[in-house]
Amino acid sequence: LFAFWPCCVKAVRVLSSPEDKGKSFGWFEGARGVASAIMTPLAVIAFRFGMNADGKHDIAGMRQVIVFYSVITVFSGLLVLWKMRDDGSKIDKSEQVTFKDIGTVLRMPAIWIIGLVTFCNYVFTLSVYYFTPYGTSLLGMSVTAGAVLAAAKRYVTPVSNVGGGYLADKFGTSRLLLISFLVMAIGTAAILLLPLNDSSTIVFVIVFLIIYFFYNVNYPLTWAMMDEGAIPERVSGTAAGIISTIGYLPEVFVSLLAGALIDGHPGVAGYRMFFGFLIAMLLLGAVFVVVWQRFLRKHGLGKGSAAKTEAQAGAQPAAKDAAA
């Protein structure tokens, strides 16, 4: 991920038009969701094939899964090499990113706000795995129903990713982000208020799928924020790396916190404490989106700002040459 992820984000920005950033990142994340939904059952087949071929040993099955994903990775790399070619022009020295540019990016307020929005959204990414155990252990939902719900998430993902991208381009990225954070927080609170019996199962499933839909609306839009904040495409890779460093920090502590709370306080108490933390982080995400909206208004930024800023920057040297 060190070099791969920033390259992906920059490629999507460069290949998409200023008016279609939301749709572009929505299709990007949606396609990843479809690929995941396809590859997961294939990986299970590879695992079973390995076990059957070697006396039903788990190690043999895992070996086949590793080989399967390795082949997919190599194939994807060759596909990129074939389809995504450079135009042959050399990068001008003025366009090359230097260590000075890294410092410039770090001083951009937009980078830190986007990073904090991503941080709050990623807390939910790591927390989503605890909803199904809550349903099965406390609401009486069957394990089979829990497995079906977990599988259904994979098919909600591409629909919400792509749909969210179109809605963002129509109504505004920051507005949709704010709505999504609030819906996720309210939905999580509603789940905590459900009676602890099997009569709540259907409501739980419906509310969870609504929450998950809006979470996947949010996920690609955090990257579309770069265009609103006038972050130059030239430094997109650097910006994505810094945003990811900030935004993915929950990876360090969320799972540990969940384990400590849920195991340390058996029953509903641990889940209430952890989901309470999650609600607080979602509301904090909404606050950061409001800060973002004020930042955009203060600086006269918004949809297509990056393209406008770069066009103005490119026009200045041309005007000087013409005057000379």
Q: What function would you assign to each model-found segment?
A:
Residues 23-48, 244-255:
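Glycine-rich segments within core transmembrane alpha-helices of 12-TM secondary carriers
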Residues 36, 109-161, 219, 254-255:
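Extracytoplasmic gate region of multi-pass secondary transporters
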Residues 48, 70-90, 288-293:
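C-terminal membrane-cytosol helix-exit motif in multi-pass small-molecule transporters
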Residues 48-70, 260-282:
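A membrane-interface helix-boundary motif in multi-pass transporters
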Residues 86-114, 311:
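Juxtamembrane intracellular "pre-TM" segments in multi-pass secondary transporters
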Residues 159-173, 262-263:
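Helix-to-loop junctions at the C-terminal end of transmembrane segments
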Residues 174-222:
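C-terminal transmembrane helical hairpin of 12-TM major facilitator-type secondary transporters
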Residues 230-266:
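A late C-terminal transmembrane helix in Major Facilitator Superfamily
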